[in-house]
Amino acid sequence: MKFLHTVAQTATLLLSLGASVEGFNRARNDACKPHHPFRPLPASTPRTKTCHVRSHGDGTDDAAFVLSALRKCNNGGKVVFDADKEYTIGTALDMTFLRHVDLEILGRIQFTNDTDYWQAHAFRHGFQNATTFFQLGGTDVNVYGSGTLDGNGQVWYDLYAAEPLTLRPILLGVIGLHGGTIGPLKLRYSPQWYQLVANSTDVLFDGIDISGYSSSKNTAKNTDGWDTYRSSNIVIQNSVVNNGDDCVSFKPNSTDILVQNMHCNGSHGISVGSLGQYKGEIDIVKNILVYNISMYNASDMARIKVWPGVDSALSEDLQGGGGSGAVSNITYDRMYIENVDWAIEVTQCYGQKNQTLCNQYPSNLTISDVHIKNMWGTTSGKRDPNVGTIVCSSPDVCSDIYVTNVNVTSPSGTDDYICTNVDESLLDVNCSSG
């Protein structure tokens, strides 16, 4: 029954995504509903010329055709990937020169499975081993259509299982984009994160359909839907995410971000972090609104994850701890969950299994002014009798964390929370000793 309910909800939202392709709205601010961005998004200017991207049609690299069309129709044009064509990309594309241009994707764009080439030539971004097939950036750039970006992920899922230091490319890299709309669009089989939004401002993601699982015993790992990094005034809305990691993750120096009207399935929740990974770095995440979310078959719903003040290792390719910074003005509002392990998880011991070490070396990063409200549903029972955990490494680094009107129970009917080093008078939940 849970599965049927999930499928029905997803199908309804997908129908609305498909219907919106024809009605692309250049007034980005008007497209944001019910909440508006923290700052107005600039409108997109009209396009007056059209270029169609050629395709070899036989699996030969079409990257040169893409660049040729972009240069021809840059500054006021539309570049079309035709519906009856398949495009193969085997070369890393730097598309950060774009100005006032649309990319209408009607066909299928697939990246080659040449793992040696991509590990050597994909663009590196200096955070958590992040690399991208391409860099999309510039000013007033829109990417939309009924077509698909395909990351050819299976070869990467199998390779990563054998060699965990493999550098797996991110499917969609929005790097240095100032003013833009991404979506409607389908994203499939990303080798790692589906989207990285870095060094960008004033971007709307609207109507993104994400899905892609492994067909072998090697699962598709680290397939976050979105990761925002050093970016501000971003809107993510009206999207369906079927993946195996964070639905949305706010990485360091993400500010003024709105996430609304999302259906997430199989994920690790909508997460602040991880933060505090790198010594000497100051990570700030502030002014985040997460609204109207359905979360199914996930590890978490509302999640804040911070590294402790001691060296820690989550995995062979993800280690850190000891960084500093602050999390503030975070709101999660109106959430429904079903078969989710933790309704709420706040931790400052991310990547460290030894809680004693976390207590001895508390996080250098503060958490304050957090509001989690209006959540209902049922957990998976995996943490029974607990349904949530709100644990800070020291009372000195957490303040003003509020939880109100949260009606979540386990399948057995319990509703306990582990609460440590937080002001329990602000938590309208049943705090237990854990």
Curated annotation (Swiss-Prot):
Gene name tied to this protein: pgaX
Top-level EC class as recorded in UniProt: hydrolase
SUPFAM superfamilies attached to this UniProt entry: Pectin lyase-like
GO MF annotations, alphabetized: galacturan 1,4-alpha-galacturonidase activity; polygalacturonase activity
Region called Disordered, residue ranges: 35-54
Pfam families tied to this protein: Glyco_hydro_28 (PF00295)
Chief location: secreted
Its EC number(s): 3.2.1.67
Signal sequence interval, chain numbering: 1-23
Originating organism: Aspergillus terreus (strain NIH 2624 / FGSC A1156)
Known role: Specific in hydrolyzing the terminal glycosidic bond of polygalacturonic acid and oligogalacturonates.
Highest rank taxon of the organism: Eukaryota
Mapped PbH1 repeat ranges: 231-252, 254-274, 327-348, 362-394
Subcellular location: Secreted
Any single GO BP term: cell wall organization
Name of the protein in its database record: Probable exopolygalacturonase X
Residues with glycosylation annotation: 113, 129, 199, 253, 265, 292, 297, 329, 354, 364, 407, 430
Disulfide bonds: 247-264, 392-398
Coiled-coil regions listed: none
Family: Belongs to the glycosyl hydrolase 28 family.
Active-site residues annotated for this sequence: 245 (proton donor), 268
